[in-house]
Every structure is written in structure tokens, then in C-alpha cells.
Amino acid sequence: MLLPDWKIRKEILIEPFSEESLQPAGYDLRVGREAFVSGKLIDVEKEGKVVIPPREYALILTLERVKLPDDVMGDMKIRSSLAREGILGSFAWVDPGWDGNLTLMLYNASNEPVELKYGERFVQIVFIRLEDPPRNPYSGNYQGSTRLVFSKRKKL
């Protein structure tokens, strides 16, 4: 079952919370302070924006910390306005028990650069209640992330 807006406000810890980002059945996550594009770490908060060149990918940190109860998971989709500009997103499930900022991958499939401003809404997360809590909520490598995190599989 997807959580409606009033249950999201009541049951999901989102910091900093924005009323503008709360949707009827989800929450729009915003561009955070760090990004990784073209082999470079970008201070998005300082620069005010991040630009994703054509046919390149970017890792973007969310502004929000999201803390999920043990019986709720998250699923994310790119906002349709960005999809219409050629941005694709590849996102993992947000496991029950997750706590931290999220590092998300976007790909610019267009022939034009796409600019994202610091604090801009770019991905919607919906929250799904499980029938029962898992025996082992998430406690993996990325738990507690507050900075952009690269893959633990490979060193950059």
C-alpha cells in the first residue's frame, strides 16, 4: 500500500522537510550539496547548480535525509519535466530501515546540457508499506550517508 501525504508527514522522517515537495502520494526530493559529473566532484551548494552534459551521467546527492521505519520501503522515479528534457534515472529500492541522504544516478540522453539548480525538485519518492516488517532491516554499506557516496565495488 502506498502512503498518502498525511501519513508521509506523520510517519516518515524527512529533513529538511518542504511542504512544496509533499505530493498526494509521494515526496519530491531536491538536489543537494554535492554531485559528481565528468569525473569531477562538484560543490552544488557553492556553485548554485550542476550541469549534466549530453550523453553523460551524474551522481547527485539529495538535499533531504530520509529515515524509513522498518515496515516501509521507498521507490523513486524521475520527475516528468526532467524526463521530457531527456534525463533518465536509475534508482535502487530504498530499503526498510534506511537512514541517510541518497546518492542518485541521472543520465542525460539528450543532445543538450541539462542544468539542475541547488534545491530543485528532481526525483519523486513514494513510500510502500510492507505486509510485515522484515527480519533484517537495512544496515548495509551506505547506511547513514550524509555525503555523496561512490560504489563500494570499485575505487574511482
From Swiss-Prot:
InterPro entries: dCTP_deaminase (IPR011962), dUTPase-like_sf (IPR036157), dUTPase_trimeric (IPR033704). The keyword Nucleotide-binding applies. Keywords: Hydrolase, Nucleotide metabolism, Nucleotide-binding. DCTP binds at residues 79-84, 95, 124, 138. It catalyses: dCTP + H2O + H(+) = dUTP + NH4(+). GO terms for molecular function: dCTP deaminase activity; nucleotide binding. Homotrimer. Pfam families: DCD. Pathway: Pyrimidine metabolism; dUMP biosynthesis; dUMP from dCTP (dUTP route): step 1/2. It is an enzyme of class 3 (hydrolase). Catalyzes the deamination of dCTP to dUTP. Signal peptide: none annotated. Belongs to the dCTP deaminase family. This is dCTP deaminase. The keyword Nucleotide-binding applies.
